[in-house]
Amino acid sequence: MNRLQEKYKSDIVKAMMDKFNYDSVMQVPKIEKIVINMGVGDAVSNSKALDMAVEELTILSGQKPLVTKAKKSIAGFKLREGMPIGAKVTLRGERMYDFLDKLVTVSLPRVRDFRGVSKKAFDGRGNYTLGVKEQLIFPEIDYDKVSKVRGMDIVVVTTANTDEEARELLTLLGMPFQK
């Protein structure tokens, strides 16, 4: 079992039950999944760009990403319906906790001028979205092999009903929010 998973079961559940006065342990919010999405706009003209993005996401997450395709044709972007334009990966269970642990303890502190992640990026239903400007903050990505600096979206989906519950859960898990 992962370090964060143990911390959740031993400490966080008790702390959340005390703070929000839940009747049952099953009411305590937990992390359901983490979705990492990488949009690759250059994939329209350069198919190698998408291959690199898929490779990087595989290294980061430990599983093969799903290639996302365009839903509509947009002439201004020279985009046809069904063209591959990105990659996403959904993490659950053990890999999800491993990734969150790595993100919070290793990767986010490596961001230049890092003062914490925004408190306003909750969606009203207890999910948190985080944008990363470059994939180089992750230690597994080799700087020399990177052809282009790409960002990604990381969505943490929780079972929390309110943003306040989700914020408390992520804070207890170690997410460095801005003061």
UniProtKB/Swiss-Prot annotation:
SUPFAM superfamilies: RL5-like. GO terms for cellular component: ribonucleoprotein complex; ribosome. It comes from the Bacteria. The keyword Zinc-finger does not apply. It holds the Pfam family Ribosomal_L5. Keywords: Ribonucleoprotein, Ribosomal protein, RNA-binding, rRNA-binding, tRNA-binding. Disulfide bonds: none annotated. GO terms for molecular function: rRNA binding; structural constituent of ribosome; tRNA binding. The keyword Ribosomal protein applies. One of its GO terms (biological process) is translation. Belongs to the universal ribosomal protein uL5 family. Part of the 50S ribosomal subunit; part of the 5S rRNA/L5/L18/L25 subcomplex. Contacts the 5S rRNA and the P site tRNA. Forms a bridge to the 30S subunit in the 70S ribosome. This is one of the proteins that bind and probably mediate the attachment of the 5S RNA into the large ribosomal subunit, where it forms part of the central protuberance. In the 70S ribosome it contacts protein S13 of the 30S subunit (bridge B1b), connecting the 2 subunits; this bridge is implicated in subunit movement. Contacts the P site tRNA; the 5S rRNA and some of its associated proteins might help stabilize positioning of ribosome-bound tRNAs. This is Large ribosomal subunit protein uL5. It comes from Exiguobacterium sp. (strain ATCC BAA-1283 / AT1b). The gene is rplE.
